[in-house]
Regions:
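Long, charged amphipathic helices and adjacent flexible linkers at domain junctions
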Residues: 33-44, 201
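Iron-sulfur cluster-binding cysteine motifs and their immediate structural context
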Residues: 1-7, 17-33
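C-terminal lobe/tail of nucleotide-utilizing enzymes
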Residues: 119-201
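Switch II (G3) loop of P-loop NTPases
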Residues: 50-55, 64-89
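Short, surface-exposed connector motifs at secondary-structure boundaries
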Residues: 73, 96-100, 120-128
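Structural beta-sheet core signal
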Residues: 79, 101, 129-131
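Inter-motif core of Ras-like GTPase G domains
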Residues: 86-107, 113
Length: 201
């Protein structure tokens, strides 16, 4: 009696585990476009590398890894990871020397922060926290961070000017000199906490 193997492509993670597990060599690989990587150069000379998954692709991790191939070992590279603790976050955090967790002082924000911290502790990563929209919630998140000894790198207040400038596609640091100083100071704090790594990303 013939036996058939059905591969559910929509659920495929492209890990190759089924290929290795099938002792009859009944499964073969094929090329598939998972996404695209685009590279942009800013007037300042900095590069932006964007990885964009194709519609319907279950796991964006291969696209993230593809984008990472275009980073340079010299200088500093910033990885922008998605929220949550799913595979894309882990794939991004795993290659970073230091992680900046952005949260909000709300019960929901604290819950997500605890999950992220637990994940990063498992990965043995160094990290600090930036509190966005500070002043809107209670003190629970501050008390928890103090209890855990986790550094607060900066607090960004709830500011309508930030929302307005962002909605116009501009950077608040380019419009408001005060925020330029704010983010410059944040950068210095991150460098101080990250230490002198041989390859800072």
């Amino acid at each position: 009696q013939a036996k058939h193997i059905q591969v559910l492509e929509d659920l495929c993670h492209d890990c190759g585990a089924c290929l290795a597990a099938c002792k009859y060599n009944a499964i073969t690989e094929k090329e598939k476009t998972l996404g695209h990587v685009s590279i942009y150069r800013l007037p300042s000379g900095a590069l932006i590398v964007e990885g964009r998954s194709s519609i319907g692709v279950y796991s964006p991790v291969p696209v993230i890894k593809g984008a990472m191939h275009h980073t340079h070992p010299d200088g500093i590279t910033l990885f922008d990871a998605p929220p949550g603790i799913s595979c894309p976050f882990i794939a991004t955090a795993d290659k970073a020397d230091y992680i900046v967790l952005v949260t909000e002082p709300t019960p929901f924000g604290l819950n997500d922060l605890k999950l992220s911290v637990q994940t990063l502790d498992t990965l043995q990563k160094s990290y600090g926290v930036v509190i966005n929209r500070s002043g809107l919630g209670d003190n629970s998140i501050y008390e928890w961070l103090e209890e855990k000894g986790i550094p607060i790198l900066a607090e960004i207040p709830f500011d309508k000017e930030i929302a307005r400038v962002y909605s116009e596609g501009r950077l608040i640091a380019e419009v408001n000199p005060g925020y330029r100083y704010f983010f410059t100071n944040l950068y210095r704090k991150i460098r101080n906490h990250a230490g002198n790594c041989s390859s800072q990303r």
